């Protein structure tokens, strides 16, 4: 696995705030509000946004607001702070403006830089453009006597050029001619990416761009960075936001842009293992979570029915009815069901495998069993899954994420212990070490 060089191995949330709001008595009010977020409402990475979220006429004032708010409140903020500057691969003037703002913000005498972990650079192009941005970071560090490479650089992937540049990172990082090892987050920007690709949809909505998200996750994994999905702008569509995160997580992209504190809460909790395990049933193409009732997993819908007969069982799925023996029914139901393990389940399995490995066994069988009730008919099912070292390492990802969160976000300890129980949290912090 490629080494990651930053304090955070995982980033769940990337939350942007305008740096200056025109027409307000206090133009920095959105920054002050964001700086006061705590617990699950506070993001892992807060991005005071001096680019798209702030009007061009307000950006000089926005840079001053960043200094003022972060110097006053940055020490207490529980996440990392990475302001977004202006930059564009085709505009030297824009790049220079962003550079000047970085110089002003990082002046040690102004008191903000000690709380700033890095900067976010949008609209990057090919790998040479990434190197230009990196050189500006190095100049800023030298100008203010900061350690070279101490400011992390995150980029927004908003063009085909930037997408292709991710394939060059492994060859370029670590060369003595650059400090690209400062790279931290690779963040998708699907709106500008859609414009750059000249893509269209009949409704005018953004394409889903699963290929971009896969490529960004792959590029981040290969380069030791962290992948983050772009903004989900239908802020009332909570279920759609959750589905997007679930799809991303299967690609290894565990972070997502958050536009509101409500989205931050959803994104902070989504990649964490569930509090309780649950059984899922494929009911004629619709995935349904079964209701757990006194140790029985029950389905009472109308897409699937089960009745006992003299010779066995009749299973009806949609309009298709089949006569099955008990063994045939169990085999069929094993193909229609799946189990979502809880945090406690994952920790139990990992502890069991660690004990077996210590006893000299390289692989063991883990059994999952349940009593299903479909309509009024019950039947027991069980299946074995072989665990070896590869299975163990794959299962470690959600635990590693939890450990990273618990170590870096003490402001969330109380909520995590309420969610799982102090005993499960303690055990989860010990497995895999």
Swiss-Prot record:
Thermal activity profile: Optimum temperature is between 45 and 65 degrees Celsius. The activity of the enzyme at 80 degrees Celsius is half of the maximum.
EC number: 2.3.3.9
A biological process from GO: glyoxylate cycle
Record flagged with keyword Magnesium: yes
Main localization category: cytoplasm
Domain of life of the organism encoding this protein: Archaea
Keyword line: Cytoplasm, Glyoxylate bypass, Magnesium, Metal-binding, Transferase, Tricarboxylic acid cycle
Coiled coil stretches, renumbered: none
Record field: pH dependence: Optimum pH is between 8 and 9.
Binding site for Mg(2+): 52, 158, 192
Pathway: Carbohydrate metabolism; glyoxylate cycle; (S)-malate from isocitrate: step 2/2
GO cellular component, one term: cytoplasm
Family per record: Belongs to the HpcH/HpaI aldolase family.
PANTHER family listed in its UniProt record: CITRATE LYASE SUBUNIT BETA (PTHR32308:SF10), LYASE BETA SUBUNIT, PUTATIVE (AFU_ORTHOLOGUE AFUA_4G13030)-RELATED (PTHR32308)
Quaternary structure note: Homotrimer and homohexamer in equilibrium.
Protein name as catalogued: Malate synthase
Lineage: Archaea, Methanobacteriati, Methanobacteriota, Stenosarchaea group, Halobacteria
UniProt gene name: aceB
């Amino acid at each position: 696995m490629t080494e990651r060089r930053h304090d955070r191995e995982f980033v769940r949330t990337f939350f942007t705030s305008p740096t200056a709001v025109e027409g307000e008595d206090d133009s920095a009010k959105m920054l002050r509000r964001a700086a006061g977020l705590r617990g699950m409402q506070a993001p892992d990475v807060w991005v005071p946004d001096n680019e798209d979220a702030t009007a061009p006429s307000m950006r000089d004032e926005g840079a001053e607001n960043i200094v003022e708010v972060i110097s006053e409140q940055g020490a207490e903020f529980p996440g990392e702070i990475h302001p977004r500057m202006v930059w564009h691969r085709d505009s030297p003037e824009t790049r220079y403006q962003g550079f000047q703002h970085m110089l002003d913000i990082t002046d040690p005498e102004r008191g903000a830089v000690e709380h700033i972990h890095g900067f976010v650079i949008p609209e990057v192009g090919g790998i040479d453009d990434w190197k230009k941005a990196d050189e500006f970071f190095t100049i800023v560090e030298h100008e203010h006597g900061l350690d070279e490479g101490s400011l992390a650089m995150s980029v927004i992937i908003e063009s085909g050029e930037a997408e292709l540049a991710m394939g060059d990172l492994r060859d370029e990082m670590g060369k003595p001619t650059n400090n690209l090892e400062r790279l931290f987050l690779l963040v998708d920007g699907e709106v500008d990416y859609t414009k750059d690709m000249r893509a269209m949809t009949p409704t005018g909505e953004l394409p889903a761009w699963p290929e971009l998200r896969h490529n960004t996750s792959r590029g981040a994994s290969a380069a030791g960075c962290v992948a983050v999905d772009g903004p989900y702008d239908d802020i009332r569509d909570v279920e759609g936001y959750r589905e997007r995160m679930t799809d991303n997580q299967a690609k290894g992209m565990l972070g997502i842009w958050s536009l509101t504190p409500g989205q931050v809460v959803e994104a902070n909790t989504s990649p964490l293992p569930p509090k309780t395990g649950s059984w899922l049933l494929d009911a004629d193409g619709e995935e349904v979570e079964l209701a757990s009732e006194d140790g029985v997993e029950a389905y009472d819908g109308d897409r699937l029915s089960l009745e006992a007969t003299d010779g066995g069982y009749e299973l009806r799925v949609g309009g298709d009815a089949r006569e099955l023996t008990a063994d045939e029914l169990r085999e069929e139901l094993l193909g229609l069901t799946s189990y979502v393990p809880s945090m406690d389940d994952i920790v139990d399995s990992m502890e069991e495998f660690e004990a077996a490995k210590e006893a000299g066994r390289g692989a063991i069988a883990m059994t999952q069993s349940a009593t299903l009730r479909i309509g009024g008919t019950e039947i027991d099912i069980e299946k074995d899954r072989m665990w070896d070292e590869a299975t163990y390492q794959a299962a470690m990802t959600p635990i590693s994420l939890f450990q990273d969160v618990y170590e870096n976000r003490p402001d969330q300890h109380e909520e995590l212990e309420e969610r799982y129980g102090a005993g499960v949290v303690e055990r989860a912090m010990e497995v895999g070490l």
